[in-house]
């Protein structure tokens, strides 16, 4: 046996590997158990010094890895046949296996490529997929790229290239980096959301949503043609109101389309169409949006910083109304909550979804508007609806607050200030500019400043500063603040509209204010303010000198904690009382709540409101309809055209896809800080594309295309379906194929989805919510078999790394930082501060996987990332630690291959009882670890077994009965070296198609047992005894143990109690 086989285990960087050539061995070579002949094609070359010629190092690893990756690609090793269709070849071989569908959250193809943190989840899913294949499952594991969107377009603009060019290049680079990891994907199914053949079906799904409406009685989406049929038959009214069955539709939109409430037969063509459009799941509406003129587009809330600026470019963002495409996700709010019970997700992710949807039960209360005497504003008959979860506190309401963007504001505002209106109510408190200047001045001058009495008097005397001027100025001020800023606990700002409403409880008049702490996207965009019992209302009432009556009496403890005299009026309280106290007597003719519990008081008040026609029981959701328009180029074009009346029509299926036109200048029209002008999408500049002649059934006509594009979310809502059938040109997915992979045999109808979906927790809300919404629409319309897209969700952790900041607080490249002898860190000689953070380009602490491939090989990187900690936990990256994983693979290599000759070094020796027990115990444990996604402990068990082999057999050949199962168990984690060793052991088929070993519990049973020995109640040592040993045997072993003499020396042994197989108790005197 060559002395080179068991030499030192140093990594490549600890020696001069560049001075030696390394033989590799042929992939299909077979050696005799004696290892007398090197594999065919292997050439052992002279190393330097004692260095063996066949050491497993980075160069040998790279050769093995590339060779096996080519073979996998050539043989289609990881192709997963469908039951039917163009990808069905080979299905007969796997037809008896249970299908299992694994997905990764597909990446955005960044221009900077991958760092070692990106593949963490991809490696984990690959390990699991390989284990399942070896365990007899038919596994589908595809991959793709989420390539549309603002980041890709902005990167193209910054680099002066077309986004198609940069996106394709980025995908190619990412594909190269991932392929070096040896991920077992079915590459025939690779998709990118920017592929025309892909977004053709994204557009088709949008049309299904556009041509559907939500029937609240049926509790599902139905084709829009069925709604029209009901209108024509007279079984459903086209007028707004509860009787019309429009509870899942905006009543305001229906009322606007049919303001007089005429029956269907009396409506003209345009009005009929507008009524129908108001019911669609995809509709156009004026929405309050985050308008970023610097980027020329609308932004999602997640793309706006806390300071009210764009995350990309740091441009100012304004809140303003724009006509946008919107998807009616709110119709599915209840189902999106209820169906969380169908999925195997963590409780924390489910709660995040529930919180975002935000269901709450309460009451809808109507407040009748009472215009001031002599005012032309606030038309008679107007009502403001408020949603509240605390109708029991209505008696304490002293004012109403509307969001500045509330749709009723313009109709409410009075022409003149009511007599006696305080100056502080007339924003901007005594500093009113002329009406035309209001928007400009307000945002700069009105930051809730203290105003003197003289200024207030001057404001009251300024005839130009009318309620409408003040409201205009305040709305301009609020438009410059983000939702986050508006919700902060700061000095309250607001403006009086000049209008009042009547409180249904007690009949008192309540002034109506606008204030930015009320958001139009929550509830009805209007609140009844009960300042004694709500902190925000309390601070507003204090700021505007409004009454603060109490409805609930605090207990004695609250008074004591707040140092307030018991019974003191709320005006003397330091803050609102938000607890549950005793109800105080209310005005005559109002609900009697004294002595009731909170739930009973709420029920009593709701019944009282319903009886009087002032309100009703209601459920509200925090969830808002999904804003779906972007004024950018790099996105899916809408398959929509408009006629001369502005009515939208879906492009016929045969005209799909609507392709993005080529543009040389695709940049949006940037408008600096212009928050007034309407956006001009880039596609609107392509005149011959934006205007098109079509025959939509009534002869050729000229139509105008929709020139907005879809958001980046669109392509990721359904990619789990396209993976199943990516080459299908007739359907987005074949029905048989979809049911094979997603339906669960024997499960309830609609129960199914992707078996395992792995990705980061940052997508725990919106991506998952939007994908669930699209899935449910497709399910309702009969296009898919499962209600939920993802049956099981697993969130992997992040890889963190040291990051460094200089004296300016700016991050510097971590790779350029040096550590001094005294432990300090410097960058080009200047001291820097170290901190830990998520690896990424923003912290300049990325480590490229290309570097790790070159230094150690892909298998080493795979093993290290899985060994760092539990897959769902964050873990720190330390490049120096990866050498441990490399040494493990070196020991594995030496367990099979002689490093000196390159020949197989295994024997036909039978395993003794100990080796058998160790092997089967490892197999059983490892199978459980793989199945439970506990890959870090799987690595630990494999290291233990490999170390056992090294210690047990030393320079001797490893028994084949131990070497082969060891290689099989390593294969999911380190597939390249496993393939090489498996082939050298004489197997021609890929190790990926071999069966995972099966452990025998009987053979894994311990022949010895460790039992504790207690002395006077404390464990002092342990005793190894034969399994099943009787008391006399244990007593003999006990007295012979050296610790027994030490513990009992010079002491009287009162009693020795032996419980065989369990414990020994010694009582000393």
Swiss-Prot record:
Record Gene3D superfamilies: HUPs (3.40.50.620), Isoleucyl-tRNA Synthetase, Domain 1 (1.10.730.10), Valyl/Leucyl/Isoleucyl-tRNA synthetase, editing domain (3.90.740.10)
**One Pfam family name from the record?**
Anticodon_1
User: Can you name one GO molecular function term for this protein?
Assistant: ATP binding
Matching entries from InterPro entries are given as: Leu-tRNA-ligase, Leu_tRNA-synth_edit, M/V/L/I-tRNA-synth_anticd-bd, Methionyl/Leucyl_tRNA_Synth, Rossmann-like_a/b/a_fold, tRNAsynth_Ia_anticodon-bd, Val/Leu/Ile-tRNA-synth_edit
Q: Which GO terms describe its cellular component?
A: cytosol
Q: Which residue ranges are recorded for the region named Disordered?
A: 19-53, 823-846
Where does this polypeptide localize?
Cytoplasm
Could you list this entry's UniProt keywords, alphabetically sorted: Aminoacyl-tRNA synthetase, ATP-binding, Cytoplasm, Ligase, Nucleotide-binding, Protein biosynthesis
Query: Could you tell me the EC number(s) of this protein?
Result: 6.1.1.4
Motif range ('KMSKS' region) = 838-842
Q: Where is the composition biased (Basic and acidic residues)?
A: 823-836
Catalyses which reaction(s):
tRNA(Leu) + L-leucine + ATP = L-leucyl-tRNA(Leu) + AMP + diphosphate
User: Motif 'HIGH' region, which positions?
Assistant: 107-118
Protein residues bound to ATP: 841
Checking CDD domains in the record gives: Anticodon_Ia_Leu_BEm
Give the protein family.
Belongs to the class-I aminoacyl-tRNA synthetase family.
Protein's UniProt name: Leucine--tRNA ligase
Higher taxonomy:
Bacteria, Bacillati, Actinomycetota, Actinomycetes, Frankiales
| GN (gene name) | leuS
């Amino acid at each position: 046996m060559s002395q080179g086989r068991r030499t030192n285990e140093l990594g490549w960087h600890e020696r001069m590997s560049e001075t030696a050539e390394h033989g590799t061995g042929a992939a299909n070579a077979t050696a005799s158990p004696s290892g007398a002949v090197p594999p065919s094609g292997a050439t052992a070359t002279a190393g330097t010094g004692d260095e063996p010629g066949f050491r497993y190092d980075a160069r040998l690893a790279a050769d093995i890895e590339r060779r096996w990756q080519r073979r996998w690609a050539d043989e289609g090793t990881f192709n997963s046949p469908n039951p039917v269709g163009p990808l069905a070849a080979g299905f007969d071989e796997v037809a008896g296996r249970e299908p299992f569908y694994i997905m990764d959250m597909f990446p955005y193809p960044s221009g900077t490529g991958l760092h070692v943190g990106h593949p963490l989840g991809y490696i984990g899913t690959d390990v699991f997929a390989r284990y399942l294949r070896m365990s007899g499952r038919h596994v589908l594991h595809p991959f793709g790229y989420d390539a549309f969107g603002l980041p890709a377009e902005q990167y193209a603009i910054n680099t002066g290239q077309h986004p198609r060019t940069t996106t394709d290049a980025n995908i190619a680079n990412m594909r190269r980096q991932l392929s070096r990891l040896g991920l077992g994907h079915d590459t025939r199914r690779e998709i990118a959301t920017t592929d025309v053949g892909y977004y053709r079906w994204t557009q088709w799904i949008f049309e299904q949503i556009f041509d559907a409406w939500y029937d609240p009685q049926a509790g599902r989406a139905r084709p829009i043609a069925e709604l029209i049929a009901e209108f024509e038959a007279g079984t459903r009214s086209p007028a707004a109101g509860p009787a019309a069955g429009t509870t899942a539709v905006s009543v305001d939109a229906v009322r606007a389309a049919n303001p007089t409430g005429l029956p269907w037969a009396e409506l003209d063509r345009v009005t009929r169409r507008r009524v129908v459009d108001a019911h669609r799941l995809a509709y156009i509406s004026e929405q309050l949006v985050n308008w970023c003129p610097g980027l020329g587009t609308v932004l999602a809330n997640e793309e706006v910083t806390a300071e009210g600026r764009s995350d990309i470019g740091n441009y100012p963002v304004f809140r303003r109304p724009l006509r946008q495409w919107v998807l009616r996700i709110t119709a599915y709010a209840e189902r999106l909550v209820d169906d969380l019970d169908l999925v195997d997700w963590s409780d924390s992710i489910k709660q995040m979804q529930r919180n975002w949807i935000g269901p709450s039960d309460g009451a809808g209360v109507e407040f009748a508007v009472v215009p001031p005497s002599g005012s032309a504003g606030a038309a008679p008959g107007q009502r403001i609806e408020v949603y509240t979860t605390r109708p029991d506190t209505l008696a304490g309401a002293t004012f109403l607050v509307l969001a500045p963007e509330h749709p009723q504001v313009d109709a409410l505002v009075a022409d003149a200030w009511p007599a006696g209106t305080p100056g502080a109510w007339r924003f901007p408190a005594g500093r009113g500019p002329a009406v035309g200047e209001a928007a400009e001045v307000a945002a700069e001058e009105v930051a809730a400043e203290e105003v003197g009495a003289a200024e207030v008097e001057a404001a009251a005397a300024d005839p130009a500063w009318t309620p409408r001027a003040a409201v205009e100025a305040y709305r301009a001020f609020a438009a410059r603040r983000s939702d986050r800023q508006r919700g902060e606990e700061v000095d309250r700002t607001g403006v009086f509209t000049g209008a009042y409403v009547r409180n249904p409880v007690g009949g008192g008049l309540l002034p109506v204010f606008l204030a930015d702490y009320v958001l139009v996207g929550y509830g009805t965009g209007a609140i009844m303010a009960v300042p004694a019992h709500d902190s925000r209302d309390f601070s507003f009432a204090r700021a505007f000198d409004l009454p603060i009556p109490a409805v609930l009496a605090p207990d004695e403890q609250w008074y004591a904690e707040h140092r307030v005299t018991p019974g003191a009026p709320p005006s003397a309280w330091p803050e609102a009382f938000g607890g549950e106290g005793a109800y105080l007597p209310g005005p005559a003719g109002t609900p009697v709540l004294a002595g009731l519990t909170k739930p009973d008081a709420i029920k009593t008040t709701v019944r009282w409101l319903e009886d009087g026609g002032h309100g009703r029981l209601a459920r509200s959701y925090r969830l808002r309809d999904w804003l779906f328009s972007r004024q950018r180029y790099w996105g899916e074009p809408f398959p929509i055209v408009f006629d001369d009346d502005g009515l939208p029509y879906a492009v016929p299926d045969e005209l799909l896809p609507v392709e993005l036109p080529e543009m040389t200048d695709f940049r949006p029209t940037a408008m600096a800080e212009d928050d007034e002008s309407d956006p001009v999408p880039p596609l609107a500049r392509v005149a011959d594309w934006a205007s098109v002649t079509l025959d939509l059934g009534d002869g050729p006509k000229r139509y105008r295309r929709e020139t907005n594009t879809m958001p980046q979310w669109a392509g990721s809502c359904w990619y789990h379906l396209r993976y199943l059938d990516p080459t299908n040109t007739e359907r987005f997915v074949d029905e048989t194929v979809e049911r094979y992979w997603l339906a669960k045999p024997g499960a309830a109808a609609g129960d199914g989805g992707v078996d395992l979906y792995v990705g980061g927790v940052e997508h725990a809300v919106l991506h998952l919510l939007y994908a669930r919404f699209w899935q449910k629409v497709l399910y309702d319309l009969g296009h898919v078999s499962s209600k939920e897209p993802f049956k099981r969700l697993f969130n992997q952790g992040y890889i963190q790394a040291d990051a460094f900041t200089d004296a300016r607080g700016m991050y510097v490249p971590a790779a350029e930082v040096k550590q001094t002898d005294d432990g300090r860190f410097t960058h080009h000689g200047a001291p820097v501060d170290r901190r830990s953070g998520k690896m990424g380009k923003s912290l300049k602490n990325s480590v490229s996987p290309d570097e790790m491939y070159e230094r150690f090989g892909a298998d080493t990187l795979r093993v290290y990332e899985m060994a760092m900690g539990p897959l769902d936990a964050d873990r720190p990256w330390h490049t120096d630690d990866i050498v441990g994983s490399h040494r493990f693979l070196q020991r594995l290599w030496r367990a099979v291959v002689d490093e000196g000759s390159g020949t197989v070094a295994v024997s036909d020796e039978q395993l003794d009882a100990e080796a058998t027990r160790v092997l089967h115990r490892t197999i059983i444990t490892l199978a459980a670890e793989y199945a439970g996604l506990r890959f870090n402990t799987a690595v630990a068990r494999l290291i233990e077994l490999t170390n056992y082999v090294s210690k047990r057999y030393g320079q001797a050949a490893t028994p084949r009965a131990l070497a082969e199962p060891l290689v099989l168990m390593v294969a999911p984690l380190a597939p390249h070296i496993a393939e090489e060793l498996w082939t050298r052991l004489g197997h021609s088929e890929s190790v990926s198609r071999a069966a995972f070993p099966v452990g025998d519990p009987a053979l894994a049973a311990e022949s010895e047992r460790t039992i504790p020995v207690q002395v006077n109640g404390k464990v002092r040592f342990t005793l190894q005894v034969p399994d099943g040993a009787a008391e006399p045997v244990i007593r003999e072993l006990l007295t012979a143990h050296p610790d027994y003499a030490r513990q009992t020396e010079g002491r009287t042994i009162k009693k020795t109690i032996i419980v065989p197989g369990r414990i020994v108790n010694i009582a000393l005197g």
